[in-house]
């Protein structure tokens, strides 16, 4: 098991070595905007560290905690979640408002579902600045 902070405190990911599977809890998102509104700069780093721990297990399949039910369980969603968080952090520094951050992220990730999660995340990030 991997315990860490992601979109909430005390997220747990379960590793089943016999079938090379990770059930990622809230650590990995699959084609959904991650809910970053419950975290901050330190939390982003903890989330990225959790993704590193999950990736180090070298699973063949990862069941994401959030995403459309018809999506695959490809481990590439670990890296996609990591890149999303890093992009969000970078654009948070490069933009001047929640709306600008939201719009820039939507341009980069137009096919992800739940834009309300992105909007809440952008508002929280800019309120902390």
Question: What name fits each language-model region?
Answer:
Residues 1-4, 98:
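A charged, solvent-exposed segment within the mature domains of Sec-exported extracytoplasmic proteins
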Residues 3-79, 87, 91:
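Metallo-beta-lactamase
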Residues 56-61, 69-129:
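Accessory terminal helices/loops
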């Amino acid at each position: 098991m991997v315990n860490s902070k992601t979109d909430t405190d005390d997220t747990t990911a379960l590793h089943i070595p016999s079938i090379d599977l990770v059930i990622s809890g809230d650590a990995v998102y699959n084609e959904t905007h991650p809910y970053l509104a419950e975290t901050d700069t330190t939390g982003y780093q903890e989330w990225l560290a959790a993704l590193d721990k999950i990736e180090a297990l070298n699973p063949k399949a990862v069941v994401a905690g959030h995403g459309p039910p018809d999506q695959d369980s490809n481990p590439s969603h670990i890296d996609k979640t990591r890149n999303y968080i890093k992009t969000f952090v970078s654009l948070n520094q490069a933009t001047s408002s929640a709306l600008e951050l939201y719009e820039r992220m939507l341009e980069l990730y137009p096919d992800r579902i739940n834009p309300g999660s992105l909007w809440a995340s952008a508002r929280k990030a800019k309120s902390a600045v």
